[in-house]
Amino acid sequence: MAVGDARGRATILGRFVGRPAGRLFAHFLRESKSAAGIIVWIGIGIVLAIIFMAILAPFLAPFDPNTKVANPETPPGGAFVMGIDRSGQDVLSRIIWGARIPLAIIAVATTISLAIGLPMGLLSGFVGGRLDRILVLVMDSIYAFPGLLLAIVIAAIIGRGVLNISVAIAIVYIPTYFRVIRNHVSQVKQEPYVEAAIALGMPRRRVIMRYVLPNVAQSIPVIFSVNAADSVLTEAGLTFLGLGLPPGIPDWGFDISLNWQRFEASWWATFYPGLFILILTTALTFVGEGLNDILNPLLRKRDLKATVEA
């Protein structure tokens, strides 16, 4: 291949992949009426509803979530739509206020995981060599531990609090971003237009940002959504075990921990927090799985081909 042809091909393909956000969003809009698109919109709608519920908690909650408003274990009915827990607190009010903690931890933990795992995956996959081997060894060592168990150990070391729990969960999911991004980068860097850009002496940073990153960008929202769903369950598990938040802060996992032993006498105090954990987790999973079908059509076709051949 002549240098001029290589330069032209790299430039043309660079323009094609140079705007990942716009291309991904346009592709999503085209597929928004498909089955996968409908699933994504359902998930987004549920997540947005929970976000607005958390933001408007001071106006939506009928009672103070930490105030005793009736006799303990009063069943649902009348002014107490979801009943009263064993502490005499309104379950509905604690559900509404308790949405704030999972959402805050999702935002912080997934952002930290993305901010660390993405550049490490790009660097490891593109540079290779000794750096790649070291990073893979470290990430595989972290990934080998069960997520909740590792989060428990980290939370026990660094202590309670929203930020500390977010950091503990973030550390658990950094290897997920790293592994997926690294594998994609290892494939993309072998493409002719990337090799042409390198042969022309283009700086590595520019090659990564202009040619490599746009081609792995479709994986980011998928990983982000799935990890967000996992973060909800991990946060609930930590607070259930008493490793999450200080007492007195409304939280769905803490409410389950507080009331589960009295399930037969006041099932509502455990059922409704668990139900909202299930709803939020399912909604985020809908978003992740739907985006995976929309943004990774080659993977979908490959899976279909493998199924047919089997």
Question: How does the language model describe each region?
Answer:
Residues 1-46, 286-310:
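Transmembrane alpha-helical segments of polytopic membrane transport and secretion proteins
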Residues 81, 85, 91, 115, ...:
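Generic hydrophobic transmembrane alpha-helix motif, especially the helices
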Residues 143, 154-157, 184-185, 233-277, ...:
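Glycine-rich helix-loop "coupling/hinge" segments at transmembrane-helix boundaries
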Residues 172, 218-228, 267-310:
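C-terminal transmembrane helix and the adjacent membrane-cytosol boundary/short C-terminal tail
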